[in-house]
């Protein structure tokens, strides 16, 4: 009897457990079905449907009415923001800086452009003693220093690529504010002068000093068939050419070999509708041009948008763009080489903020970007350090040599691919110069050096002195850190720091700010907007 009761009890418990499991199963299945049944996206709507139909569909799927389910919009992929400093440190330095190039007797002003002639010489354009300052142009882009006359010295120099010696020079008594230089396949030299608002074509090596073709009206800025501070020229094999009308008009123009206008395109990022991200064909100073013959492309350095835009050279149709967060928001110039499947060699620029701590971390380098992957391959700089104000760049067709024109310091830099050159340190360069000096003054005699062996007492005294100096330095460092953090009862707790900036101290704050993501840029803004302690000391280009 007892065993029968136990069996009944066990059977009842088993039945209860089975019922509970069945109940849970019935509850779970509808829940799973409910989460899977609603469609994640809206139904396709015919492109001819009107806006009312689209609005009705959105309302129908967004919870209006009973029984409607919540619509889950597809979210754009989240982009991780890289640590710029860390990622830059990972990039390889594939080019070696040539300290001893050019020759010591080459005297330069601000170097604005660099190209190659048919003989392989490095041809540069420089401003000698002219500086683009705050008062160089008025608010109407009129040049204010015409009274000084043209630059008296040669503004174009051709340097031998191996030795850096001057092979020939020209361009005296003609230019006022040099900017762009391009040597075309026929060895003609194309130049732009931002003060004169003109574009010039000269015969090889300058000919007799007179331009074979002149576009624009001297010292008369404008639009239409006039220019306003043109920046660069690129020339096709058939003689047709492009002009970047950069600082004011933000456009690119294509001309026939004879100088007849074929077409033009481009809109100014700093006028009209405000955009968070600049659309295609918009420019914030098209600053340099380069050709990609294999793809029949013309590429432009969109300076203040920090990108390269490429277009079909036949009709100006947008093709592609290249940008990388490690380059930053300012991209001054680029040059193309077919090496390694096609690469762009790029130089960026310093932050446009003057006299304050930059809002975003920025390093000024040369970069090599693969056009296939759109990824940075390597970086380079003088002695693997940063540039200050690079303005233009040129690269040989084989990609083995790179030349960078810099405004300040006023230099032309040479880099050679590491597979072809041995690195030479600054100390080695200094030693070689010191050796040359010693040979000049007295030959190769090496002075005798007396070797002194310190005693144990001297070593003890020196050790105590070093220990005292080290402890003093450590205390001073701790004191300085605590004072900076405000841990001391006195000091700089109430002082305003440079990074606690306000709009009043920012260059952009001096201009109108009415767009999201971009600051209005003064169309007179120069290339040489380097970080300085005060606005008054800032140079322009």
UniProtKB/Swiss-Prot annotation:
<feature type="repeat" description="NHL 4">
    <location>
        <begin position="374"/>
        <end position="418"/>
    </location>
</feature>
<keyword id="KW-1003">Cell membrane</keyword>
<feature type="repeat" description="NHL 3">
    <location>
        <begin position="272"/>
        <end position="314"/>
    </location>
</feature>
<feature type="glycosylation site" description="N-linked (GlcNAc...) asparagine">
    <location>
        <position position="92"/>
    </location>
</feature>
<feature type="topological domain" description="Cytoplasmic">
    <location>
        <begin position="480"/>
        <end position="541"/>
    </location>
</feature>
<dbReference type="InterPro" id="IPR000720">
    <property type="entry name" value="PHM/PAL"/>
</dbReference>
<dbReference type="Pfam" id="PF01436">
    <property type="entry name" value="NHL"/>
</dbReference>
<dbReference type="InterPro" id="IPR011042">
    <property type="entry name" value="6-blade_b-propeller_TolB-like"/>
</dbReference>
<keyword id="KW-0479">Metal-binding</keyword>
<dbReference type="GO" id="GO:0007619">
    <property type="term" value="P:courtship behavior"/>
</dbReference>
<feature type="signal peptide">
    <location>
        <begin position="1"/>
        <end position="33"/>
    </location>
</feature>
<dbReference type="GO" id="GO:0043025">
    <property type="term" value="C:neuronal cell body"/>
</dbReference>
<feature type="repeat" description="NHL 2">
    <location>
        <begin position="215"/>
        <end position="258"/>
    </location>
</feature>
<keyword id="KW-1133">Transmembrane helix</keyword>
<keyword id="KW-0456">Lyase</keyword>
<keyword id="KW-1015">Disulfide bond</keyword>
<keyword id="KW-0862">Zinc</keyword>
<comment type="function">
    <text>Peptidyl-alpha-hydroxylglycine alpha-amidating lyase that catalyzes an essential reaction in C-terminal alpha-amidation of peptides. Mediates the dismutation of the unstable peptidyl(2-hydroxyglycine) intermediate to glyoxylate and the corresponding desglycine peptide amide. C-terminal amidation of peptides such as neuropeptides is essential for full biological activity.</text>
</comment>
<dbReference type="GO" id="GO:0005886">
    <property type="term" value="C:plasma membrane"/>
</dbReference>
<feature type="disulfide bond">
    <location>
        <begin position="299"/>
        <end position="310"/>
    </location>
</feature>
<dbReference type="GO" id="GO:0044719">
    <property type="term" value="P:regulation of imaginal disc-derived wing size"/>
</dbReference>
<keyword id="KW-0677">Repeat</keyword>
<comment type="similarity">
    <text>Belongs to the peptidyl-alpha-hydroxyglycine alpha-amidating lyase family.</text>
</comment>
<protein>
    <recommendedName>
        <fullName>Peptidyl-alpha-hydroxyglycine alpha-amidating lyase 1</fullName>
        <ecNumber>4.3.2.5</ecNumber>
    </recommendedName>
</protein>
<dbReference type="GO" id="GO:0046872">
    <property type="term" value="F:metal ion binding"/>
</dbReference>
<feature type="region of interest" description="Disordered">
    <location>
        <begin position="521"/>
        <end position="541"/>
    </location>
</feature>
<feature type="glycosylation site" description="N-linked (GlcNAc...) asparagine">
    <location>
        <position position="315"/>
    </location>
</feature>
<dbReference type="GO" id="GO:0004598">
    <property type="term" value="F:peptidylamidoglycolate lyase activity"/>
</dbReference>
<dbReference type="GO" id="GO:0006518">
    <property type="term" value="P:peptide metabolic process"/>
</dbReference>
<keyword id="KW-0472">Membrane</keyword>
<feature type="repeat" description="NHL 1">
    <location>
        <begin position="164"/>
        <end position="205"/>
    </location>
</feature>
<feature type="transmembrane region" description="Helical">
    <location>
        <begin position="459"/>
        <end position="479"/>
    </location>
</feature>
<feature type="disulfide bond">
    <location>
        <begin position="228"/>
        <end position="248"/>
    </location>
</feature>
<dbReference type="InterPro" id="IPR001258">
    <property type="entry name" value="NHL_repeat"/>
</dbReference>
<dbReference type="GO" id="GO:0005576">
    <property type="term" value="C:extracellular region"/>
</dbReference>
<keyword id="KW-0812">Transmembrane</keyword>
<keyword id="KW-0325">Glycoprotein</keyword>
<feature type="topological domain" description="Extracellular">
    <location>
        <begin position="34"/>
        <end position="458"/>
    </location>
</feature>
<keyword id="KW-0732">Signal</keyword>
